[in-house]
From Swiss-Prot:
Phylogenetic classification of the source organism: Bacteria, Pseudomonadati, Pseudomonadota, Gammaproteobacteria, Pseudomonadales
Descriptive protein name: Large ribosomal subunit protein uL5
GO BP term, pick one: translation
UniProt record similarity statement: Belongs to the universal ribosomal protein uL5 family.
Sample GO molecular function, one term: structural constituent of ribosome
UniProt superkingdom: Bacteria
Keyword Secreted recorded: no
InterPro entries linked: Ribosomal_uL5 (IPR002132), Ribosomal_uL5_bac-type (IPR020930), Ribosomal_uL5_C (IPR031309), Ribosomal_uL5_CS (IPR020929), Ribosomal_uL5_dom_sf (IPR022803), Ribosomal_uL5_N (IPR031310)
Subunit text: Part of the 50S ribosomal subunit; part of the 5S rRNA/L5/L18/L25 subcomplex. Contacts the 5S rRNA and the P site tRNA. Forms a bridge to the 30S subunit in the 70S ribosome.
Organism (species): Pseudomonas savastanoi pv. phaseolicola (strain 1448A / Race 6) (Pseudomonas syringae pv. phaseolicola (strain 1448A / Race 6))
Task of the protein: This is one of the proteins that bind and probably mediate the attachment of the 5S RNA into the large ribosomal subunit, where it forms part of the central protuberance. In the 70S ribosome it contacts protein S13 of the 30S subunit (bridge B1b), connecting the 2 subunits; this bridge is implicated in subunit movement. Contacts the P site tRNA; the 5S rRNA and some of its associated proteins might help stabilize positioning of ribosome-bound tRNAs.
Positions of transmembrane segments: none
UniProt KW keywords: Ribonucleoprotein, Ribosomal protein, RNA-binding, rRNA-binding, tRNA-binding
Length: 179
């Protein structure tokens, strides 16, 4: 079992049950999935960009990546319908907890000039989104072998009913929020 999953079951869930005054342990908010997305606007001119992004995201997550395609043509962005414009991957269960553990203990401390995560990046339903400017903060990526620095979006989907419950859950996981 993943280390963070065990900590959630033994320490975080009982503590949150008390803190949020819930009657049943199944009501306690939990992280259901983590979605990583890399939007690749520069892939329009160069198909190799998609291949490199797929390889990077597969190294980071240890899971097969899905290429996303443009739904409709947009002349202003020089995009045609059906062209590959990004990659994404959804993590659940043990892989999700292992990724979250690596993100909190290894990757976020490696961010340059890191002052903490924005506590206002919740969506109103307890889900949290954050952006990473460089993929090299992950230990799986070798700095010498990358072709370009790319950012990615990380979304944590929770069962929390509102932002306060979601914030309490992520604080219990020791997320380094700014305020």
């Amino acid at each position: 079992m993943a280390r963070l999953k065990e900590i959630y079951r033994k320490e975080i869930a009982p503590k949150l049950k008390e803190e949020l005054k819930l009657s049943n342990v199944m009501e306690v908010p939990r992280v259901t999935k983590i979605t990583l997305n890399m939007g690749l606007g520069e892939a329009i001119g160069d198909k190799k960009v998609i291949e490199h992004a797929v390889a990077d995201l597969e190294k980071i997550t240890g899971q097969k990546v899905v290429v996303t395609y443009a739904r409709k043509s947009i002349a202003g962005f020089k995009v045609r319908e059906g062209w590959p414009i990004g990659v994404k991957v959804t993590l659940r269960r043990d892989r999700m907890y292992e990724f979250l553990d690596r993100l909190l203990s290894i990757s976020l401390p490696r961010v340059r000039d890191f002052r903490g995560l924005n506590a206002k990046s919740f969506d109103g339903r307890g889900n949290y989104s954050m952006g990473v400017k460089e993929q090299i903060i992950f230990p799986e990526i070798d700095y010498d072998k990358i072709d370009a620095l790319r950012g990615l979006d990380i979304t944590l989907t929770t069962t929390a009913k509102n932002d306060d419950e979601g914030r309490a859950l992520l604080r219990a996981f020791k997320f380094p929020f700014r305020n």
